């Protein structure tokens, strides 16, 4: 079978080694004669797996004991509601840094629970879009917390600065950013991430939260979204998505085998640099993002002649390059280069882009 490269923004590629291991263990996990999907989440074997997964994640991100790691459900959109219900702590406002679709979606959901402020940080210099540096964010001293999204998957924008805001709770939507590079977890109070991009399959959401901000949920908070309830029950207040948890744990082990986040960060930069170089050296393809804020995870680009979009996608798919269509909001193309995307996949895409430009340019 010809190699297929999946450039989907999510659900996204899972490392081939991980899929092969899951396939091998599917019918008989740990010699139990059953799949992990069939055994109790309260069994000794599952609990051991869950503890290992948390330990491996802590090792990768260097998470100190002052933080809890929660494995939840509901995706990032569930957290859009959970965050204000857990963190407002009787205050009436929070600051939402608006850098694109997902950060704005979090802001819109927060309006159900408080009067949040949207701080728009995008600006256009000529034809290139940029983002205001953090020291220019107009933070409200009375806000309960600051929420931002370091990587906007639809727009292909990233914030690489790490936040340093004194006496402020900092919340980050890391759904498409987590485990792609090293971060200083101590600069945050809560980060959350849907798994379906850099962690594993859809269905599980990871929350890393400073212990001292747990326990202040409003009375209206559903138990399934209450961080203290989830924490007290070791992420098993209800039956968790067991297979997604297991597969995420395999991905954590795979990442450690690759050399950890320093090695992954280096590879991710190499992949995105290769693709951006092709775009920048061409009059046939366009990227509209300032180089300082280009996403390494989601490379968005357009063809100068949009009439060729359909042909580009059709021919790319024939060569094993799938799911390159850009989001309907921005159009064009989007190549998602998450951790599981090998360098060879990006090289194949660049080679195809050169062929397509030569043929239709």
Swiss-Prot record:
PROSITE patterns: AA_TRANSFER_CLASS_5. Its EC number is 2.6.1.52. Its cofactor is pyridoxal 5'-phosphate. Pfam families: Aminotran_5 (PF00266). The keyword Cytoplasm applies. Keywords: Amino-acid biosynthesis, Aminotransferase, Cytoplasm, Pyridoxal phosphate, Pyridoxine biosynthesis, Serine biosynthesis, Transferase. InterPro entries: Aminotrans_V_dom, Aminotrans_V_PyrdxlP_BS, Pser_aminoTfrase, PyrdxlP-dep_Trfase, PyrdxlP-dep_Trfase_major, PyrdxlP-dep_Trfase_small. One of its GO terms (biological process) is pyridoxine biosynthetic process. Binds 1 pyridoxal phosphate per subunit. The modification N6-(pyridoxal phosphate)lysine is found at residue 197. L-glutamate binds at residue 42. One of its GO terms (cellular component) is cytoplasm. Catalyzes the reversible conversion of 3-phosphohydroxypyruvate to phosphoserine and of 3-hydroxy-2-oxo-4-phosphonooxybutanoate to phosphohydroxythreonine. Homodimer. Belongs to the class-V pyridoxal-phosphate-dependent aminotransferase family. SerC subfamily. This is Phosphoserine aminotransferase.
